[in-house]
Amino acid sequence: MHDLAVKWCVHIKMSETLLLLFLFALKHGVCDLALQAIYCRPSHKHIFLSPRAMMHSLHHGVGAWIVLIPFTNYLTAITFAVLDGVSHHLIDYSKSSIVRKKNWSLDGKMYWVATTVDQNLHFSVYFLIVYFVMIF
């Protein structure tokens, strides 16, 4: 009976973890595609304090808070939401600055390599957030 209970607890924790990762993926799509296209173009992300770039990062932070609040307490949700927004801003700023400095265009290979790195960094942040939320 004990083994069954342990398996059930592991299953529930794994289901919560996968759900949270899925919700972060949805949040990312909404914020990085739809909201950015509607509210943040042109974003001038290569300018560190660009208002539209800051709004884009705020969308990610608020989205992260909405995703996290059912899974954790208020303070933890706020902390990781701020981490998501700030890290998103720094990642986007870094990518945009490099792309602009190197003069890489949308139809060039290096732009898409930079975008791949950018997206992988964002999702790495999500994995870390989910990991820490789930272990505490």
List the model feature ranges, each with a label.
Residues 2-136:
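Hydrophobic alpha-helical transmembrane segments
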